[in-house]
Swiss-Prot record:
Location of the region described as Talin-interaction in the Swiss-Prot/TrEMBL record: 168-208
Cell location: Cell membrane; Cell junction, Adherens junction; Cell junction, Focal adhesion; Cytoplasm, Cytoskeleton
Source organism of the structure: Mus musculus (Mouse)
One Pfam family it belongs to: Vinculin
Sequence positions bearing Phosphoserine: 97, 260, 272, 275, 290, 346, 434, 574, 579, 600, 721, 795, 809
Gene Ontology terms describing biological process: adherens junction assembly; apical junction assembly; axon extension; cell adhesion; epithelial cell-cell adhesion; lamellipodium assembly; morphogenesis of an epithelium; protein localization to cell surface
Protein family: Belongs to the vinculin/alpha-catenin family.
Chain residue ranges for the region called C-terminal tail: 879-1066
Stretches the record annotates as N-terminal globular head: 1-835
Protein name per its UniProtKB record: Vinculin
Region feature Facilitates phospholipid membrane insertion, mapped onto this chain: 935-978, 1052-1066
Subunit organization: Exhibits self-association properties. Part of a complex composed of THSD1, PTK2/FAK1, TLN1 and VCL. Interacts with APBB1IP, NRAP and TLN1. Interacts with SYNM. Interacts with CTNNB1 and this interaction is necessary for its localization to the cell-cell junctions and for its function in regulating cell surface expression of E-cadherin. Interacts with SORBS1. Interacts with SYNM. Interacts with CTNNA1. Binds to ACTN4; this interaction triggers conformational changes. Interacts with FLII.
Length: 1066
């Protein structure tokens, strides 16, 4: 099957596919319409010349290369494409003498398919060799990174740095060239991100090595921390380079990304549970412990972390973990309630507490088992990939030693482990059957090589057979691992809501559990937010979560019984929709408040840690102060990460912002202990310049990452909501200051004033970012003026707070401080108003009465009513032709996933009128064409021309959507929205080109009996996946274009009308 993950492959395959499509149409005209096929000598000669040139270049490459795999895989591709070319030439010759020849038509269609398939194989084989060149450079850097462990002198460090630099530069250049060549946008981003991380870590590595060498040679304290810093940086760089190697080998969508994320999430959850378990059990053992204190919070956090693991599991494992979490949560509520009523020492309370304690042990064991199973399957999967890679090199070398057989045996052993962990017996048996076949073939090949017959035709054929069988085995084990995981919901809130809505609308349709998984994900985030809330707010949010859970279970039960379309199900669906809306609103309100509190000040704890680390050696309680500030910094960093994750989960962010937040949270978690280690080295080596520079490097890296995280969190939540929450928080801080002054508590006053100043500065930061993001001069001017006014009010308030703290009973000072506080509040309100421009009054106010002029003249007489027939009423506006989506007819064979993707795009576009909006018109047209393609792709004879033409029409509409979206982006004043729109719409041309190529491939197979079911199904699968990607990209483009149109330039000549067919409030 053709793959086109690079621009070069795509640019070569597209014209070939275009030529082949003409031949396919001629074939169908001859076969179905009985037309004579015209003389094909000239077009076939053109194809033959292009293919011959490609083969010649390929053969020259094989002659000069040292890549054994390339030498092995190129010749079969040459043979395939040359045989296909021969068939085409024979067909042209036969048709010259007989334009109606049936054998000639068969040669024509088989040759066409062979040309496309063979050319693709040839290009892919060559591309794989290019990738191996880059991987060799990457592996060279990986090997050299391990040398860092033996560098113990400054001379060695200088040499190491000099040697590492050129290799890093070469790798960076190759990766940059490769990412520009890739057609998959996600793969490009992954490569760029990993390479950027490696570049950022290089100075950190040199700094860590330098401090290690310094402390080791001077025999100072802190050598253990220096060693940790160095090893962490080496491991982090190695992990990123390994990720680069993995992504370089991807040719289609990324199937492995979830595995490492899930394993990592489970390990982190397990570590968090272990760290909280003693504190939780201590609270349960103590009948006098207060409800709501750190011990109870530890239990809530354990249940939260275990719930995250449960969501990553499937089937019975998932039900058991989540069920245990819910039960323990309810029992903890009961224990807390009894203690709040003073009955903590009662037999009932003591028994409940003991049951919770035992339940926590059971839950921890379940979580450990789940983590162990996923890690075992993931490790086996990764091990199989490495061993098969090594085995392929052995299979390509006729004189290879016995180590290759060992690699194959190792891969088979790992595959057996996956088979044993499979829940599906059919999958397990399929893998085990493949193991037996590969073992027998490998044994036979090994015997031939030991007899010195490794270069014989039989041995070479066997080697090729084993290579193919190993690739098939890898596909089967990958699928088994993927199927063992639950259905994956979208990573962002709007995506989850959309998936949930689709299931609610059609609960009987099999969506592989995605809709229910999305609802579970939303409910899980609701529980997470509730865990940090207090009293009635917490109970209210939990009640909303339980309501959604109950309604989902009831609707799923009705759907399972075949009653998903019944009136009862419709009523339930309506209730569930309303409950989801309520839950979403309350979650976003809670999350915005938490962001306002936690992100009001991100850097003070690390600055205080820096002060403690540089304290003079004779400072009192130097170590104790440092330990306290290190713990505060660690807790603060953890809170930032947890809150950022909530903002990502329930904010208004798109997928790329969510992934950006997740990446920055991961980096913060990794960096925090390294910053503390660097600070401890500085504490134990006062005055050491190398230690100071190293700490500054680590500190700045942490601060840069948190600033990036803060910016992404601000993108993820509504700016006005954040400003509202900050304004309310400042009011509460002012109220606390009033209480402090009334009770003569200067420290409480200072804390309140400090909080006000931090929140005001946070608002300034948000406003500054929005000004930088906008190109609307009026908006920029208004926000900047309001920000400047706010900026001027902060310092006077701080000065007044210091004055009143020094003499808290002075009424005059108290009044000055409160006046300053109210001035800040007023300035904050003006910033908020700048983000919410006043809407014009509707209806407009009446005219000024003073402008009225009365005269003595009489009004003219009223004209008579028209006589005769009453004119007919105005006819209703004509219905838009593209409104109705075609329903599947009884007995009609269609491709269901393709039809569903088309329907989803049509549903999105139908929200808007296509009058005056060419993007909507083109999107609806594409959806209807894709619905037609879902029928053609399953058709028999007589549909080749229609399939090819349909793909061309879809590509034409795609070009129209892309062109219009770029016009909208050009006029949009919001840089973020513009970038999002361009990123989405720029995917469309590549995908639509691929659709044309894949449709041509599929057309060559329609009605043919000499094609295997597996090959035909593979072609359909690729076409379906491409269609789904295209429909999704256009759907996202429609949404982003609508968002961009709100921020369009007022003087823009280009406009699109966005008129909702169904208003949002209905």
């Amino acid at each position: 099957m053709p793959v086109f993950h690079t621009r070069t492959i795509e640019s070569i395959l597209e014209p070939v596919a275009q030529q082949i499509s003409h031949l396919v149409i001629m074939h169908e005209e001859g076969e179905v319409d009985g037309k004579a096929i015209p003389d094909l000598t000239a077009p076939v000669a053109a194809v033959q010349a292009a293919v011959s040139n490609l083969v010649r270049v390929g053969k020259e490459t094989v002659q000069t290369t040292e890549d054994q795999i390339l030498k092995r895989d190129m010749p079969p591709a040459f043979i395939k494409v040359e045989n296909a070319c021969t068939k085409l030439v024979q067909a042209a010759q036969m048709l010259q003498s007989d334009p109606y020849s049936v054998p000639a038509r068969d040669y024509l269609i088989d040759g066409s398919r062979g040309i496309l398939s063979g050319t693709s194989d040839l290009l892919l084989t060559f591309d794989e060799a290019e990738v191996r060149k880059i991987i060799r450079v990457c592996k060279g850097i990986l090997e050299y990174l391990t040398v860092a462990e033996v560098v113990e002198t400054m001379e060695d460090l200088v040499t190491y740095t000099k040697n590492l630099g050129p290799g890093m530069t070469k790798m960076a250049k190759m990766i940059d060239e490769r990412q520009q060549e890739l057609t998959h946008q996600e793969h490009r981003v992954m490569l760029v991100n990993s390479m950027n991380t490696v570049k950022e870590l290089l100075p950190v590595l040199i700094s860590a090595m330098k401090i290690f060498v310094t402390t080791k040679n001077s025999k100072n304290q802190g050598i253990e921390e220096a060693l940790k810093n160095r090893n962490f940086t080496v491991e982090k760089m190695s992990a990123e380079i390994n990720e680069i190697i993995r992504v370089l080998q991807l040719t289609s969508w990324d199937e492995d990304a979830w595995a490492s994320k899930d394993t990592e999430a489970m390990k982190r959850a397990l570590a968090s549970i272990d760290s909280k378990l003693n504190q939780a059990k201590g609270w349960l053992r103590d009948p006098n412990a207060s409800p709501g204190d750190a011990g109870e919070q530890a239990i809530r956090q354990i249940l939260d972390e275990a719930g995250k693991v449960g969501e990553l599991c499937a089937g019975k494992e998932r039900r058991e973990i989540l069920g245990t979490c819910k039960m323990l949560g309810q029992m903890t509520d009961q224990v807390a309630d009894l203690r709040a009523r003073g009955q903590g020492a009662s037999p009932v309370a003591m028994q409940k507490a003991q049951q919770v304690s035992q339940g926590l042990d059971v839950l921890t064991a379940k979580v450990e088992n789940a983590a162990r199973k996923l890690e075992a399957m993931t490790n086996s999967k990764q091990s199989i990939a490495k061993k098969i890679d090594a085995a392929q090199n052995w299979l390509a070398d006729p004189n290879g030693g016995p180590e290759g057989e060992e690699q194959i045996r190792g891969a088979l052993a790992e595959a057996r482990k996956i088979a044993e962990l499979c829940d599906d017996p059919k999958e397990r048996d399929d893998i085990l059957r493949s193991l037996g076949e590969i073992a027998a073939l490998t044994s036979k090949l090994g015997d031939l090589r030991r007899q010195g017959k490794g270069d014989s035709p039989e041995a070479r054929a066997l080697a090729k057979q084993v290579a193919t069988a190993l690739q098939n085995l890898q596909t089967k084990t990958n699928r088994a691992v993927a199927n063992s995981r639950p259905a994956k919901a979208a990573v962002h809130l709007e995506g989850k809501i959309e998936q949930a809505q689709r299931w609610i609308d059609n609960p009987t349709v099999d969506d592989r559990g995605v809709g229910q998984a999305a609802i579970r994900g939303l409910v899980a985030e609701g529980h997470r937010l509730a865990n940090v809330m207090m009293g009635p707010y917490r109970q209210d949010l939990l009640a909303k979560c339980d309501r959604v859970d109950q309604l989902t279970a009831q609707l799923a039960d009705l759907a399972a019984r075949g009653e998903g379309e019944s009136p009862q199900a419709r009523a339930l669906a309506s209730q569930l929709q309303d409950s989801l809306k309520d839950l979403k609103a309350q979650m976003q309100e809670a999350m915005t408040q938490e962001v306002s509190d936690v992100f009001s000040d991100t850097t003070t704890p690390i600055k205080l840690l820096a002060v403690a680390a540089t304290a003079p050696p004779d400072a009192p309680n130097r170590e104790e102060v440092f330990d306290e500030r290190a713990a505060n910094f660690e807790n603060h960093s953890g809170r930032l990460g947890a809150t950022a994750e909530k903002a990502a989960a329930v904010g208004t962010a798109n997928k790329s912002t969510v992934e950006g937040i997740q990446a920055s949270v991961k980096t913060a978690r990794e960096l925090t202990p390294q910053v503390i280690s660097a600070a401890r080295i500085l504490l134990r080596n006062p005055g050491n310049q190398a230690a100071y520079e190293h700490f500054e490097t680590m500190k700045n890296q942490w601060i840069d990452n948190v600033e990036k995280m803060t910016g992404l969190v601000d993108e993820a939540i509504d700016t006005k909501s954040l400003l509202d929450a900050s304004e309310e928080a400042i009011k509460k801080d002012l109220d606390k200051c009033k209480v402090a002054m009334a009770n003569i508590q200067p420290q409480m006053l200072v804390a309140g004033a400090t909080s006000i100043a931090r929140r005001a500065n946070r608002i300034l930061l948000v406003a500054k970012r929005e000004v930088e993001n906008s190109e609307d001069p009026k908006f920029r001017e208004a926000v900047k003026a309001a920000s400047d006014e706010l900026s001027k009010t902060i310092s006077p308030m701080v000065m007044d707070a210091k004055a009143v703290a020094g003499n808290i009973s002075d009424p005059g000072l108290q009044k000055s401080f409160l006046d300053s506080g109210y001035r800040i509040l007023g300035a904050v309100a003006k910033v908020r108003e700048a983000f919410q421009p006043q809407e014009p009054d509707f209806p407009p106010p009446p005219p000024d009465l003073e402008q009225l002029r009365l005269t003595d003249e009489l009004a003219p007489p009223k004209p008579p009513l028209p006589e005769g027939e009453v004119p007919p009423p105005r006819p209703p506006p004509p219905e838009e032709k593209d409104e109705e989506f075609p329903e599947q007819k009884a007995g009609e064979v269609i491709n269901q996933p393709m039809m569903m993707a088309a329907r989803q795009l049509h549903d999105e576009a139908r929200k808007w009128s296509s009058k005056g909006n060419d993007i909507i018109a083109a999107a609806k047209r594409m959806a209807l064409l894709m619905a037609e393609m879902s029928r053609l792709v399953r058709g028999g004879s007589g549909t080749k021309r229609a399939l090819i033409q349909c793909a061309k029409d879809i590509a034409k509409a795609s070009d129209e959507v892309t062109r219009l979206a770029k016009e909208v982006a050009k006029q949009c004043t919001d840089k973020r929205i513009r970038t999002n729109l361009l990123q989405v719409c720029e995917r469309i041309p590549t995908i639509s080109t691929q659709l044309k190529i894949l449709s041509t491939v599929k057309a060559t197979m329609l009605g043919r009996t000499n094609i295997s079911d597996e090959e035909s199904e593979q072609a359909t699968e690729m076409l379906v996946h491409n269609a789904q990607n295209l429909m999704q990209s256009v759907k996202e483009t429609v949404r982003e274009a609508e968002a961009a149109s709100i921020k369009i330039r007022t003087d823009a000549g280009f406009t699109l009308r966005w008129v909702r067919k169904t208003p949002w409030y209905q």
